[in-house]
Amino acid sequence: HIELGADKNLDNIPFERIRQDIIAQYLRGGLNTVSWHLNNPLTGGDAWDVKTAGVVTSILPGGAKHDQFIGWLGKLATFLNSLTAPDGKKVPVLFRPWHEHTGSWFWWGRSHCTPQQYKELWKMTHDYLSKHGVNNLLYAYSPGGEDKVEDYIERYPGDNYVDLLGFDCYPSADVQGTDAYRKSMTTVLTYLTQLGKEHNKPIAVTETGLEALPIADWWTEVLFPLVDKYPISYVLVWRNAREKPNHFYAPYPGQASAQNFVEFYNHPKTKFCSDIKNLYK
């Protein structure tokens, strides 16, 4: 909750630790992605508090909570501007604001604002951060895995405000869930490949993963065949939660899919941080 001036994020990780880890990943030659699950400025609830209408309206210019929200953006800008390497250079970050907006579980989601209001929110965020010296961001647009390209692009703020096209897509662990996941991933990656060409933007799977990884060969038999066919920049799996033992998306030693993940890691067509040289040159 950086917008509140808290010292820890919603996963109870100190922001100073996050800052240090972002810099360390950059020094290793890797890329950091950052999302923002900010509180509901109208109710004081969390990002999932969608009981009250008009939250986005309230923070746009002229809204009752606009000044408060601008203060929140200021705190975010301070943190992003603090991401500097030992040589003084700012650390590049892939910033993924207002994500999964085609769903309605966040207060900035589809049912809670118009397409125009969403675009205004995105542009206001972008312009404020740019004006306040945050010049180390690449902006990622990441709706949910929409079956129709029209739904994907409906709230797109424009090529001048977006650097990468992504999407978030998750399966359930049963056979039906895996089949539906394959279908959804294929549908989105097919049209996203075309959109990337049309808009001259790289594409990515900005969130995915199988919770608790009960399918032992998920990495090589489910995920890899899906992403192998398309020109994606990266695929990101979600977090391993300290406070929820079964809420994890990357394996640990001895976990059912751990050996399969090693096979995935060693595949000649996958690249991890140690495989990438001179990303920033």
Residue ranges, per PLM feature:
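Active-site beta-loop-alpha junctions enriched in small/polar residues
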Residues: 3-5, 37-39, 98-100, 142-146, ...
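Aromatic- and acid-rich polysaccharide-binding/catalytic face
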Residues: 152-182, 238-240
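Aromatic-lined carbohydrate-recognition surfaces of secreted/lumenal glycan-active proteins
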Residues: 93-98, 122-151, 200-214, 237
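Substrate-binding cleft of secreted/luminal carbohydrate-active enzymes
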Residues: 201-281
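Substrate-binding cleft of extracellular glycoside hydrolase catalytic domains
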Residues: 7-135
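Aromatic-lined glycan-binding groove of carbohydrate-active enzymes
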Residues: 157-162, 188, 192-202, 232-233, ...
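Alpha-helical scaffolding within the catalytic cores
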Residues: 16-20, 76-79, 143-157, 183-195, ...
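Extracytoplasmic/secreted cell-surface and envelope-processing proteins
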Residues: 7-10, 42-45, 104-107, 148-152, ...
